[in-house]
Amino acid sequence: GFVFARPETGKTTFLSHIATFMAGQTDRPILWFNNEEQGEKVRVRSYQSTLGLTTPQLFKHVDDNERRYLEATKGNILLYDDASIYRGDVETIIKEHQPSLVIFDQIDKIRGFDADRPDLVFGRIYQWARELAKLHCPIIGTCQSDGTGEGVKWLTMSHVAEAKTSKQAEADWILGIGKSNEGGTEDVRFFNISKNKLM
């Protein structure tokens, strides 16, 4: 499945929370393919999510927090940070590590797919991710909401950027994270599951 939202709404932070929660429950690694933000920012969010610390608190006792983080996650979160992640590299890394979960932040930017139109490229990417999930483990991707999702609390499948059907058709579940522009709600997020074939 995938999580989508407008830029700077909290997709990476949300996935960081999910990954750190799951990491302590498995003996197999969680592979996080990051082609969106600086890898160090993702790593800091993972530490903050796991330990419940602000940035100043995290950096006040770096060595102790590193130890606590590794104990809590069992060292199971492996971050692959590259602006150009190719499908062949992903397949090789998955076979090598046999992960319990794979995260693509952002799945739309995975390279190695060709088609005549962008929506067909995205369809192939999401179909490929679905096949990986069948063969190996659950896959979670992130992508953007289009401009119609700006200021919308409850995002639906129609707000997914660059595709009205191709991405949505391949997902077992879709979670939209909305954010209102109303005063006093800047820090509030609104979660809407617009597709769920798991139940």
Regions found by a protein language model. Give the residues of each.
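P-loop NTPase motor core
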Residues: 1-41, 49, 79-192
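Phosphate-binding loop that captures ATP/GTP phosphates
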Residues: 49-75
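A conserved SF2-helicase RecA2
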Residues: 191-199
